[in-house]
Amino acid sequence: VEFVDDIEIPASVNLDNCYERILTWVKGRFTQPNVTKGELLSDNQDTRRITMRIQQNLVFKNTALVTDMTKVSYNLTFAVKEENGKKKCTVTMTDISYLYEENRENGGISFTAEEWITDQEAFNKNKTKFLKTTGKFRIKTIDLFELISNQTKETIDTL
């Protein structure tokens, strides 16, 4: 499972400046309290590519009596480039895995996105609605990627 978003960079923006701004934002964004681990795997100024390994909590439900959540781990890549005369930042989320109910006696359940959030796994047999258990993982993972993409766009828009 891979999520990709190409974010347009205005023609007037210098790509090196854009790369530096995104790198600064990334270093702050992935140290927030819901992020349990944010590791910068690589940042290459020559290719303008940033790769991170993130582990964070995704909360499905949080009440006084029940907290339903999972730890999600994923790789996140930001590539600032020019292709066919257009400047863009490609945001890619890959290698997604989950650790669910880790506080249980058995240490919880580990699984990958391919095992849990694909169309085949997340929908009922008629493909008309999400399954209760797997659907929530798909929805929250897509929401997370959209949030990261939107925050990246906002970061670019400040240049």
Give residue ranges: language-model regions.
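Ser/Thr-rich, low-complexity intrinsically disordered terminal regions
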Residues: 1-159
